[in-house]
Amino acid sequence: MAYGSITQRGEAFRVCFDYGKDGSGKRVRQYQTFATKKEATRALNAHKVKMDQGTCVLPSEYTFAQWLDYWYKDIILPQIEETTAYGYRGMIKNYLKPELGEIRLQKLTARDIQRYYTWLMDEKGLSPNTVIKHHNLLTNALNAAESQEYITKNPMSAVSPPKKRQHEAKFYTPEQLGVLLDKVAGTRLELPVYICAYLGLRRGELCGLRWSDVDLEHQTVTIENTRTQAGKKEIEKGTKTVSSTRTLYLPDTLCEMLKTAKEREQECKTAYKNVYDDNDYVVVMEDGKPFRPNYLSELFSKFLTDNDLPKIVLHELRHTFASLSNQAGIPSFNIEKALGHSTPATTQKIYTHLLDRTHTQAVEGVAAIADEARRKA
């Protein structure tokens, strides 16, 4: 039995998966388009093996859980970042499968999904913004089911997601920042807190910062790598966007602190000898091992609690940088440059190997406020 065929359409290849006849004698076929003949052939061969083994499921028999497994592994996983994949796995395993998984794919309705959103918010306590992430996943998964003709009508066309709530960023006042900088002095959080407060870095940029990115002689630091976390796995990659890759000016206070940290690192290398983890990262523990991003956030949160300081997350030191820049009268364009935001103005002209001094005023303005607040603390 043939079980299907491959037809070239332009530069793409369309596979017809033949499932034989259903109970009413009607022949059941499914179609899917692939970019290369190799991919199309591999998919058709896999279909043939399942048909021969008797493990192939008719499209009409697919449960939503089975579709999610196929969509995640074969369609979306090759297209997304590891951190996104980790989030999708969690949503599918912990929420979608338990609540909707047993429903036949072709029987899944807009009402089922709308009730699912209510369940997430009322029973599971998820925020509307988090539920919107579930909505986006469902839209992607069911659009794929529709395009591959597993469903004839997409229920997502009649589903209304919850209204997105605008997140109001929290940040420290100059006085609060001064107290934080005073209390963090001499602790293992001193360097990471100063870097985030004085430069406005993202957590991933902070954790991905290497000494090879730091030029103490010319007082610059180049932001071009990140280190993030998906579950227990740490992921090293480039910056978030093209405009996130940037070279920043190092104010005197931070430059001196980095020089001290470099000297301290040499002392630790001598003390720990062969067990020292010499990896070139700037933000490390005494034995040279880099801080895991989530652990660094946990340490920061605990430090604030232990010292009766207002609760913010580590990323909100970046918001503090933006707020203090604005308070210092720095033009918004220069603040965006320092933060590495993607805007039409900055994406047109990105300098990664030369220092763009348009942002220097922002960095120096925040440094002046922070230094003054620290002295008063």
Name each model-derived stretch.
Residues 1-11:
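Short N-terminal "domain-start" leader segments
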Residues 9-111, 261-278, 371, 377:
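N-terminal DNA-binding module of tyrosine recombinases/phage integrases
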Residues 19, 30, 60-61, 72-155, ...:
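N-terminal core-binding DNA-recognition domain of tyrosine site-specific recombinases/integrases
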Residues 33, 208-214, 336-342, 352:
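A short, basic/aromatic helix-end/turn motif that makes direct DNA contacts
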Residues 124, 128, 182, 186-189, ...:
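Short, basic (Lys/Arg/His-rich) helix/loop patches that form interaction surfaces
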Residues 128, 132-134, 147, 151-153, ...:
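Basic, Lys/Arg- and aromatic-enriched nucleic-acid-binding interface segment
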Residues 163, 171, 227, 339-365:
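Catalytic-site neighborhood detector that most strongly recognizes the C-terminal catalytic loop/helix
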Residues 182, 218, 231-260, 264-267, ...:
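C-terminal secondary-structure termini that scaffold catalytic or DNA-interacting sites
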